[in-house]
A protein has these predicted regions:
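Catalytic core and acceptor-binding pocket of nucleotide-sugar-dependent glycosyltransferases
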Residues: 141-203, 318-323
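Acidic donor-binding segment of Leloir-type glycosyltransferases
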Residues: 44-65
C-alpha cells in the first residue's frame, strides 16, 4: 500500500496579458493555500512543477521543480515522480480544488492508502491521487492533458475511486468567471481571498442571478459541458426550473475541439438565426443564462486566444481581437436577461457555489 503521498502541483502555461496574469496569480495563490492545507492534513511534502524560472515558494516542505524543456504532461509528471523517488502522489493543477481544506486532503490520502486511485472527476480530472508504481506511471506517461489522467489510469485497469461531487471537489480556477464566483461568495483560502479582494472586476451581473436559484417561479438556462452529476445537483438543490443543453462533455480531454470535431446544437441554432434572435430566444426560455463559450468556439472551429476567452468571460468585448467572440460577448451584454459566460468550471463548481451562496443569503433574509 502506498504511504506518505506528496502533493505535486503543476503551475505553467502562464500568459503575459493583464487578464491572464490576474487568473494565473489567483491560481498560484490557490496552489499555495492548497499546499498549506495539505500540510495541515498530514501531507508534509509538496512539489511545484513549473516552467517559470523565477518561481520561488517560501513554504515549509515545498520544493520547486523547474524545467524549460518542451512540455508533455504525462512524461513530465512521471519524470518528477521517478526522479524524486515518490511513493505516492496527489496531483493537482494550480488552481484546482481551491476550496480543499486539511480534512479533504486527509480523506484523499486515507483512500489512497487503501490501494485505490482517487480523483475529483473520473471523466475530466483536476485532482488525481495514485500510487507511484510502474503500472500507474506507464499509464501516466501517455497522458497529454491532466484532465485525461484519471480516465487513463482507469483504462489501464487500475481501480479509481471518485470523490463525491460537491462544491469543494468541483470548484476550479480556469478563467475569470471562476474568480467572479469566488469573489462574490467569499470562498477560498487566505491567499486567494486576499488576491480576490484587490481585483476590480464587477460581480453585479453574477449577483443578479442569485435570487433565481431559490425562486420556484424562475428558470435558468445552462448550456455547455454539463455532466449528469451537475444536472442532478441542480435538479435536487435549486428551487428554480433548469433548462439544460448538455453538449461536448470531455471535449478537451478527448481532443475534439483541437481536431475540429466538436458540434453544438446551440451553435447550429446561432448560425441559423444570428446573434440578435439567439439572445432574444434565450430570454424567452429563462430568466438568466449560463453559457460555456468554449463549446461554441469548438463548434465554429475558432481557436480564440486565452486572452480573448478571458476578456469575454469578464464582459470586455472592445479588447477582444477575435471577431465572432467579440460580437457574441457584446450581444450577451446587451441581451434582455443576465448572460454569464465562462468555461467548464462555471458549468459545475461555479453553478454549485452560486446556488449555495444564494440559499445562504436567503436563509439570512438578505
Amino acid at each position: 500500500m502506498p504511504e506518505s503521498p506528496a502533493l505535486v502541483v503543476f503551475y505553467g502555461g502562464t500568459g503575459d496579458s493583464p487578464v491572464e496574469r490576474t487568473v494565473d496569480d489567483a491560481r498560484l495563490s490557490a496552489a499555495l493555500d492548497a499546499a498549506e492545507a495539505a500540510r495541515e492534513g498530514g501531507i508534509d511534502r509538496a512539489i511545484f512543477v513549473t516552467d517559470q524560472s523565477d518561481l520561488a515558494v517560501d513554504l515549509a516542505g515545498v520544493a520547486v521543480d523547474i524545467s524549460a524543456e518542451p512540455f508533455h504532461f504525462g512524461r513530465r509528471l512521471a519524470d518528477v515522480v521517478r526522479r524524486r523517488q515518490l511513493d505516492a502522489v496527489i496531483y493537482a493543477g494550480a488552481g484546482s480544488v481551491p476550496l480543499f481544506a486539511a480534512d479533504d486532503f486527509r480523506e484523499v490520502a486515507s483512500r489512497l492508502a487503501r490501494g485505490v486511485i482517487v480523483t475529483n472527476n473520473s471523466f475530466s480530472s483536476d485532482l488525481v491521487a495514485f500510487p507511484a508504481n510502474e503500472p500507474a506511471l506507464a499509464a501516466v506517461e501517455r497522458v497529454e492533458r491532466d484532465n485525461a489522467l484519471a480516465r487513463a489510469l482507469s483504462e489501464a485497469g487500475l481501480p479509481v475511486d471518485e470523490l463525491a461531487r460537491t462544491v469543494t471537489t468541483q470548484m476550479d480556477i480556469d478563467s475569470p468567471s471562476d474568480l467572479l464566483v469566488l469573489g462574490l461568495t467569499g470562498e477560498g483560502g487566505p491567499r486567494l481571498r486576499e488576491h480576490l479582494a484587490g481585483l476590480p472586476p464587477d460581480t453585479a451581473l453574477y449577483a443578479r442571478t442569485l435570487p433565481l436559484f431559490t425562486d420556484r417561479a424562475s428558470q435558468i438556462v445552462v448550456a455547455g459541458r454539463v455532466g449528469s452529476h451537475s444536472w442532478a445537483y441542480l435538479e435536487r438543490e435549486t428551487a428554480c426550473r433548469v433548462r439544460l443543453f448538455a453538449e461536448e462533455r470531455g471535449m478537451e480531454a478527448d481532443g475534439r475541439a483541437e481536431a475540429g470535431a466538436a458540434r453544438s446544437l446551440l451553435g447550429f441554432f446561432l448560425e441559423s438565426v444570428g446573434l440578435d434572435r439567439f439572445f432574444e430566444t434565450l430570454s424567452e426560455l429563462g430568466d438568466a443564462a449560463f453559457i460555456d463559450t468554449r463549446v461554441l468556439l469548438g463548434h465554429k472551429r475558432i481557436a480564440a486566444s486565452r486572452q480573448d476567452r478571458f476578456l469575454s468571460d469578464l464582459g470586455e468585448p472592445d479588447a477582444i481581437s477575435e471577431p465572432f467572440l467579440r460580437d457574441f460577448t457584446r450581444s450577451a451584454l446587451a441581451a434582455p436577461l443576465p448572460v454569464l459566460l465562462g468555461g467548464h468550471s462555471l458549468m459545475s463548481g461555479g453553478l454549485m457555489a452560486l446556488n449555495e451562496h444564494a440559499w445562504a443569503l436567503s436563509e439570512q433574509g438578505a
